[in-house]
Amino acid sequence: MSGIHKMSDKKLNILTLAFGIALLPPIWAVLSPYAGITTGAVALICAGLYVANGNKKEDALKITIGFLLGDLWAIIAIWVMETLQFNPNVELYLTLFILGGLAGLIGENIPKYIFTPAWLCGWAIGLTIMGPLSIDSLGTLPIQIGASMIAGVIYVGIGVDAFQKFIIKTIKK
């Protein structure tokens, strides 16, 4: 038996996962700016949530929907806070209270279609990137963020998992 075939399953999983993470996400990081996407790192955050949910391909769509709703929620929050004429802390609290409550109510009532943790995470991502900007200066940022979210779940999350399984299967032949 060669050395690679004697390796424990745990060690093989660790090494192939590390190789997949080292190989695939940097391709997105290098190529995404050529597509006009400046928010490529968002993909890693979104892939992390996908993996934390157990790499369940059957949940990929509802996780993606959750992220995209979070992106939309960030735009709505920015618009609401820009429109209100209260103390900024009151505006922030009320906006987070109402939109957070609505996200929880909506997402948890239709969990077949929406993964609420992804919605909240996507909202936080959107607010972190777009929060300091005015609604008029967002430009294509929401689209870039959404594209990075989709890439995170599909390309990085599902892609690295499939790549790892392929490598392990090939090695074990």
Predicted features along the sequence, with ranges:
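Hydrophobic alpha-helical transmembrane segments in multi-pass integral membrane proteins
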Residues: 75-85, 128-142
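Transmembrane alpha-helical segments of multi-pass membrane transport proteins and ion-pumping complexes
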Residues: 21-33, 67, 71-79, 96-108, ...
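Membrane-interface helix caps and helix-loop-helix hairpins in membrane proteins
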Residues: 31-34, 56-57, 81-87, 106-113, ...
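Alpha-helical transmembrane segments and their membrane-interface boundaries
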Residues: 2-55, 139-142, 146, 153-173
